[in-house]
Design a protein with these regions (language model features):
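Receiver (REC) domain active-site loop signature in two-component systems and cognate sites
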Residues: 59
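Short, glycine/charged-rich "phosphate-handling" switch motifs in NTP-dependent
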Residues: 103
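Charged docking surfaces used in two-component/phosphorelay signaling
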Residues: 18-26
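C-terminal output helix
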Residues: 110-120, 131
Length: 145
């Protein structure tokens, strides 16, 4: 049996962290949680990186956009899969997320099955496939303007 995927859930809302932890743990993930982008960046500065990050956009101190930008600018985490999760479902926000380098996008409230499916979908792609998918999503959203 292979080791479970490691997920880092980053959200300032305790109920969302708890729900995501419960759902992902039941799906076989090993879950770590952070209450802010700042806390997530501290966790990600260590040697034991997760396989994927579920990242909220609206958080105090360091928001999801800034966290994603810092992750993509760091050689250690530049290719770490990141799925953005936000109540902001506006096309401009979605385009911003893809442009900054997210690998997936979930709206809140998220569908429990959809959360697990999206993380598995992103994890199934290698780095080149994720970058290609990002470019395609950006082009689709730009055309839809």
């Amino acid at each position: 049996m292979s080791a479970p995927f490691k997920a880092l859930v980053v959200d300032d809302a305790p109920d969302i962290r708890l729900l995501a932890d419960l759902v992902l743990s039941m799906a076989g993930f090993s879950v770590t949680a952070a209450a802010s982008g700042k806390e997530a960046l501290q966790l990600l500065s260590g040697d034991d990186l997760p396989d994927i990050v579920l990242l909220d956009v609206q958080m105090p101190e360091v928001d999801g956009w800034e966290t994603l930008t810092l992750l993509r600018g760091d050689g250690r985490t530049a290719d770490l899969p990141v799925v953005m999760c936000t109540v902001k479902g506006l096309r401009e926000d979605t385009l911003k997320g893809w442009s900054l380098g997210c690998d997936g996008y979930l709206g809140k409230p998220f569908d429990i099955g959809g959360l697990v499916d999206e993380l598995h979908r992103v994890l199934a792609r290698d780095g080149d496939q994720r970058r290609a998918h990002r470019r395609i999503r950006i082009a689709e959203l730009a055309r839809a303007r």
